[in-house]
Amino acid sequence: ATGWDGLDLLTDNERIIGELQHLYKSDRISLQSGAGYFYLDGKDRLVFYDPFPFEVEDKVEDKHANLYSYAQLDLPHEVVGTIGLSGDLIDSNVTDREELNPKLGITWQPADSTLLRGAVFKAVTRSLINSQTIEPTHVAGFNQFFRDVPASVYWSYGIGVDQKFSQKVFGGLQFLQRDLDVPYQDIDDAGMPISAEDDWREQMASAYLYWAPVNWLSLGLEYFYEDFSQEEIEIGGVPGTEGITNHRLVPQVSFFHSCGFSARVWANYVDQKREFNEFIPAGASESDQFWQIDAALSYRLPKRYGIVSLVGKNLFNEEFNYIDTDQANPKFLPEQQVFLTLT
């Protein structure tokens, strides 16, 4: 259940997923081929409390079948190529799709300390259980699956470089642009529901620099840039939002001990600007800047059985006004939280 002031969204869904994969490897070629099927059956209930209680129920059904094959080729002159093709068949309440998705990626190592990467690929967003799949999720190091609106179709274009400056200093840059066709249900002039699509564009850039002066200490600095724009439907579940720009700086320090204990402290400095359409009376834009401090204490179990971690998020209980583009997996928590994980 997800709640806002005056209403609740309640979901009751049953999901089934099955996947099969075949692996082939020779001296210069490795091949991953497979198929999958996903089925969702359930209902969403929107409960209103003001001015009087009532609810709206919507049946949800989603069928998604896919096939794929990825070939990784070891080419001369330290070049590795990726060529792939996938197909998606979708039958859902919102839209039906039949898509063929080419994949092309290349990595080149002109020197022992330098790696260049590039990729162009098409993909379709699926309603996966916890976003889990055994299909390759990266093409030349670029992520191809995101938590978008289900059945979204998008082309991605990426370029990046990873550099080893010395035995103790590493860095890199990456840029990825995604052009999306996002399905949604609209209302025609007669008041009847119709299937429609919105054009989204996402531009994401990142940079990192890590330094390990000694074997028990690591220092790092990361920068992330995100720019989201759309025309018709809201971003991040907030009506009227037509553009979001994020700048995020992440300094971090990590400590390690040979007995299996490790500790990490990191901060996020966030600068977000939001653009709204003419239907929002509060104004055309707003922004917020804030710091959030997090920490984790971990222990690696013997024989690599797993890692136990005590994690603290938003340690100083920082308040902020932030729209997350991934509501199911938010980057920042609005209040202090401490939890234990086992991986």
State where each predicted segment sits.
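Residues on the lipid-exposed face of transmembrane beta-strands in outer-membrane beta-barrel proteins
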Residues: G18-Y24, L67-L73, L104-W108, I159-Q163, ...
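Face-selective signature of the C-terminal outer-membrane beta-barrel domain
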Residues: A1-V94, Q167-L176, R201-S206, Y210-F224
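Conserved C-terminal beta-signal and adjacent last beta-strands/turns
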Residues: E242-T343
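Outer-membrane beta-barrel channels and translocator barrels
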Residues: K25-I29, P76-V80, Q109-S113, Y154, ...
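Gram-negative outer-membrane beta-barrel transporters
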Residues: D74-E78, G171-D181, S195-N277
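Outer-membrane beta-barrel signature, preferentially recognizing the C-terminal barrel domain
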Residues: T11-N13, V60-D62, T95, N101, ...
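Surface-exposed extracellular loop regions of Gram-negative outer-membrane beta-barrel proteins
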Residues: D41-F48, D91-D96, L100, W108, ...
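Extracellular loop and loop/strand-boundary signature of outer-membrane beta-barrel proteins
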Residues: T2-L10, I17-E19, F48-K59, G87-N93, ...
